[in-house]
């Protein structure tokens, strides 16, 4: 099929409203929350402030994206890329450049989030000392993660129908494990007579000193729990719905409610923050990860078997997320290819009606990120100069840096999308029905996003080697994108290939 036929081929809508809400809920909720929630209580009762700030920031983003889905419609792939086209147009090279940059930036979130899959096996078994201290076991788990990543690449080529079935299977197991952890958390609360509610909601001896930077860094961490909002706007053409805004808002409400319930339950567990159940000194009964809940609830005989079950569920969570990322990231590349910014073959579909070459492009980018991130363990140790990190700690730092990069890219996208959104509203397009509370939420959210972005781009603490590495990686990938843009300008002589645009 020719490029033009591919470009104008009618889109097969493969998600019903209910399926999309379920897909979106599973895509956003789960992995990020259980990865960061235990760190929230280092600030005691102010942890609820962190949850509130993160939720307010993302609520405004969600409302703006859902509002823009009404203004721009849902006939074409691209999400926030289409928003940039609507705000700036494509008549000048400057407008085309910033429009492309918006689309390129949002396409980077998937590859950086995808890095977590191979490492998640290692972190899942952190409470088993024989694994944590065994380099051979750690390498084996990492290799296993890469093999699973390759298997996911193969599955993702079989189209949304196949992917939906795979994601459903992974999601069922994932939620059994996540909800099982919360139930076991309630059991641990009972065994300690609810002492954790006092321990985690007061500024006790082991709670970190409250400061502006602590609040900012912890809020950024909490944003991981809501990651993926910007990705979902890229696949709206695959959704059969007359009110995509309602779908987004229902999903956000469900995610926030789940997090609030989970937050309350976990705040009642003793032994958080790396300290034992006595709260006096670090020991083996500390709740270091979500998996520790399984480990401690299982006791002497069932602790390791339950931890293995958690590890498998945590892995399936990552597999489901990776499949979802492949779907959304591929469609971001499709939008750029349709306009000629990327090679036209990326827009081709296979017999399963999947953009298979866009899927390969997504996977190649993820592999490139993985290769570059291998540098992280070999960076100079900021804590102990001249001393190399042990393998487990090095992997932990690698995952931490990858998460920080993914959040940073998301913050950049939220910031520039808000700028474009305000430009569109200034033109009085679709703004007649915007209520005052919605406008207020945009203002509060934009302020939160702006502070989080610039404090993380230019931290006012001691500069670390990982800060230099993060900025270098961002510069490298943006340079690659600029290369594609320059090639497109030369090839198409400053004209975009005709494609579907915002209404």
Swiss-Prot record:
The chain crosses the membrane at residues 20-40, 43-63, 106-126, 138-158, 166-186, 215-235, 249-269, 301-321, 359-379, 405-425, 443-463, 468-488. One of its GO terms (cellular component) is plasma membrane. It is a multi-pass membrane protein. Keywords: Cell membrane, Membrane, Transmembrane, Transmembrane helix. It is found in: Cell membrane. Pfam families: AA_permease. InterPro entries: AA-permease/SLC12A_dom, APC_superfamily. GO terms for biological process: transmembrane transport. PANTHER family: AMINO ACID TRANSPORTER-RELATED, ARGININE_AGMATINE ANTIPORTER. To M.genitalium MG225. This is Uncharacterized protein MG226 homolog. It comes from Mycoplasma pneumoniae (strain ATCC 29342 / M129 / Subtype 1).
């Amino acid at each position: 099929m020719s490029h033009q036929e591919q470009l104008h081929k009618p889109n097969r809508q493969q998600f019903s409203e209910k399926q999309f809400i379920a897909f979106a809920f599973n895509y956003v909720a789960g992995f990020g929350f259980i990865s960061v929630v235990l760190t929230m209580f280092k600030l005691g009762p102010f942890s609820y402030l962190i949850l509130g700030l993160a939720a307010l920031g993302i609520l405004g983003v969600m409302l703006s994206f859902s509002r823009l889905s009404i203004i721009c419609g849902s006939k074409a792939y691209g999400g926030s890329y289409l928003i940039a086209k609507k705000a700036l147009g494509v008549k000048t090279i400057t407008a085309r450049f910033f429009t492309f940059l918006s689309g390129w930036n949002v396409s980077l979130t998937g590859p950086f989030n995808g890095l977590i899959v191979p490492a998640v096996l290692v972190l899942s078994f952190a409470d088993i000392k024989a694994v944590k201290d065994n380099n051979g076991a750690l390498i084996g788990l990492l290799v296993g993660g890469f093999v699973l990543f390759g298997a996911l690449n193969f599955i993702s080529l079989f189209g949304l129908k196949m992917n939906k079935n795979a994601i459903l299977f992974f999601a069922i197991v994932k939620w059994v494990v996540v909800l099982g952890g919360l139930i076991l958390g309630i059991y641990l609360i009972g065994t300690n007579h609810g002492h954790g509610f006092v321990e985690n909601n007061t500024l006790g001896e082991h709670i970190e000193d409250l400061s502006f930077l602590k609040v900012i860094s912890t809020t950024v961490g909490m944003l991981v729990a809501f990651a993926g909002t910007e990705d979902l706007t890229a696949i709206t053409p695959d959704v059969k719905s007359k009110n995509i805004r309602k779908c987004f808002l229902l999903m956000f409400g469900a995610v926030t409610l789940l997090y609030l319930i989970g937050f309350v339950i976990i705040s009642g567990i003793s032994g958080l923050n790396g300290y034992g159940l006595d709260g006096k000194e670090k020991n083996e009964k500390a709740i270091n990860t979500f998996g520790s809940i399984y480990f401690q609830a299982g006791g002497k005989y069932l602790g390791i078997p339950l931890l293995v079950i958690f590890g498998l569920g945590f892995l399936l969570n990552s597999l489901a997320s990776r499949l979802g990322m492949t779907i959304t990231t591929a469609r971001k590349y499709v939008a750029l290819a349709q306009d000629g910014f990327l090679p036209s073959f990326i827009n081709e579909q296979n017999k399963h009606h999947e953009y298979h070459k866009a899927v390969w492009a997504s996977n190649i980018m993820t592999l490139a990120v993985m290769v570059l991130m291998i540098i992280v363990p070999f960076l100079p140790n900021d804590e102990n100069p001249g001393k190399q990190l042990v393998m487990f700690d090095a992997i932990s730092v690698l995952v931490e840096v990858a998460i920080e990069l993914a959040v940073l890219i998301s913050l950049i996208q939220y910031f520039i999308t808000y700028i474009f959104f305000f430009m569109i509203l200034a033109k009085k397009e679709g703004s007649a029905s915007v209520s005052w509370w919605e406008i207020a939420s945009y203002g509060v959210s934009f302020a939160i996003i702006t502070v989080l972005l610039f404090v993380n781009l230019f931290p006012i603490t001691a500069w670390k080697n990982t800060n230099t590495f993060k900025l270098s990686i961002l510069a490298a990938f943006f340079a690659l994108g600029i290369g594609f843009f320059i090639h497109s300008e030369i090839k198409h002589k400053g004209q975009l290939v005709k494609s579907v645009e915002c209404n």
